[in-house]
Each structure stands twice: as C-alpha cells, then as structure tokens.
C-alpha cells in the first residue's frame, strides 16, 4: 500500500532506514555502499532504495529539507511501512567554538525554534533526544573505524538565513555544537510513533567563523559518516 508521498509496497523497506536530505545522495549511497540495491519509491523525485550491507537489509531514502518534509516521510515510513530505526545522515553548520569543519557530530539532543514538538504535548517543551542504543552503536562504530566524533546538543532551525548572527554565539555559550533543519522533527516523530531515531552529521561550514569545506572535499567526509551509520546497524 502506497502513501501520498511514497509509492512503495509494504515490505519494500527494511526496518532500518538511513535518511540523507538530498535524494541524489540516497541514490549515491545505494549505488556505492549497498549490495543488490533496488529503487522502491520515486514520488516527487524523493528517491528511496533497499539493499543489503554486509548481509543486513537496509534502506536509504531522502528526507528533503526542513522539519515538515522530514516529518511527513518519517511518519509514513513508521506507520505505513513498519520502519523501526531512522538514522539521519547529512551536513550541518558548526556552532561550537571547538567544532571544526569536517568534524563528525552525533546529535544527542536537538533544541529548536520550531513549535512542532510543543504542538505534540499541548504547548509543553519536549526534550527531543536520540535513542540511546542507536546513539551508542553509532559512537562505538566511529571509534572502531578510528574516526573522532563529537556528541552533544544541536539546534534545529526553521530559518536557514538568520537575521541576527549573534544568536549562534548565545547557543555556543550553552554548549550547542551545530545547526541543522531536521533533527528535532525526526526525534519528535519517532517518539510519537514508537520508533527509534538518531542523527549524525559532517560539519560542512561554521556559521560563526565562516570557514567552509571546499566542495571537492565534501564527498570524502560524507563517505566517512555513511560508513559510520552503516557499521552501526
């Protein structure tokens, strides 16, 4: 049975789905990391694939940009297709003073300027956090691969272009490591519908210092993050 946004059949998705924002990255991962990968959905060019990694079934599907896009795909994957584990993989902007471009970051929790999680619990702040087991498996996979990673709080925003850049300095004082646009929504959906979720990123640029990863170097650091995610399942 398909949904308005996913034209797959029940059983087409593995219990674990990796979710990059860009559907073309989903295609890249399927073609370069999975065995026997097949495309299972393509509505609005939001591509999804299922294959195996070291014999384990795994799916890859794009999430699009922002909490609304991530939330509708995550909900449909969980409710209609029986997905149990959702792992966001993507880039982020560094905030922390000790965060460098190319760093790998695990989002232990995600604060946000969106009201989406408040709406879930009648205006009450909801602590959007990663599933502990997925997080632990990810951190251990990074260690086994010899990849240093940071673990901590991130900030999920609805506004890509902030009017006041000093805002990020306030977040740095609170120990927030990085900014993205999806994680708080993903964690909220997973909590609401009884699934597990975790997000990890590579730092593509730093929103305070202005430092950025050259475009030709981004793929190699992205590959490291994908490897961590796949080894963690």
Curated annotation (Swiss-Prot):
PROSITE patterns: PNP_UDP_1 (PS01232)
Function comment: Catalyzes the reversible phosphorolytic breakdown of the N-glycosidic bond in the beta-(deoxy)ribonucleoside molecules, with the formation of the corresponding free purine bases and pentose-1-phosphate.
Signal peptide residues on this chain, from the entry's feature table: none
Family the UniProt entry places it in: Belongs to the PNP/UDP phosphorylase family.
List of residues binding a purine D-ribonucleoside: 5, 180-182, 204-205
UniProt entry keywords in alphabetical sequence: Glycosyltransferase, Transferase
EC number: 2.4.2.1
PANTHER family noted in UniProt: FI09636P-RELATED, URIDINE PHOSPHORYLASE
InterPro entries reported in the protein's UniProt record: DeoD-type, Nucleoside_phosphorylase_CS, Nucleoside_phosphorylase_d, Nucleoside_phosphorylase_sf
Full protein name: Purine nucleoside phosphorylase DeoD-type
Summary of subunit composition and partner proteins: Homohexamer; trimer of homodimers.
Listed Pfam families: PNP_UDP_1
GO cellular component: cytosol
Catalytic residues identified in the record: 205
Sites annotated Important for catalytic activity: 218
Reactions this protein catalyses: a purine D-ribonucleoside + phosphate = a purine nucleobase + alpha-D-ribose 1-phosphate; a purine 2'-deoxy-D-ribonucleoside + phosphate = a purine nucleobase + 2-deoxy-alpha-D-ribose 1-phosphate
Residues involved in phosphate binding: 21, 25, 44, 88-91
Entry's Gene Ontology molecular function annotations: purine-nucleoside phosphorylase activity
Gene3D superfamilies: Nucleoside phosphorylase domain
BP-aspect Gene Ontology terms: purine nucleoside catabolic process
